[in-house]
A protein has these predicted regions:
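Terminal targeting signals and extreme-terminal segments of soluble enzymes
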Residues: 1-67, 73-128
Length: 128
């Protein structure tokens, strides 16, 4: 399991005085980018091919930060399925998501397999 703290910014809040629903995708992306950077030990080159998000609770600017948790569910040849959660610092689940990403070669514009080193680190993340 991987976790990252993400700041709640003033611009994230909408007229209803809570974090706008679209911003949760940004929080998840920030956590996922940090996770991929650690796993790939470099620039995280991936594309999101499927994203399912459930919004569970409000987050307000006064919360200051949220915790993004990434758990690996399935590792394919080029794809990775993760369970991603946005939690308040008090531990309340604000959003949860299931995300499928594909390792991407930007030069050729197509999926590429994970390297052996990446697979080893991802397998470790699956088995914990």
């Amino acid at each position: 399991m991987f976790e990252r703290l993400v700041d709640v910014r003033w611009r994230d809040v909408d007229a209803l005085r809570h974090v706008n629903h679209a911003v949760f995708l940004t929080y998840l992306e920030e956590g996922r980018d940090a996770f991929y950077a650690q796993v790939t030990r470099g620039d995280p080159m991936y594309v999101v091919v499927r994203l399912e998000v459930n919004l569970r609770a409000e987050v307000r600017h006064a919360d200051r930060q949220v915790r993004v948790r990434i758990e690996v569910e399935r590792l394919g040849t080029t794809s990775l399925t993760t369970r991603e959660t946005v939690l308040t610092l008090s531990g309340e689940v604000a959003a949860d998501a299931r995300v499928v990403t594909v390792r991407w070669d930007a030069d050729y514009g197509k999926p590429v397999p994970f390297s052996e080193d990446e697979r080893a680190r991802l397998t470790e993340a699956v088995t914990g």
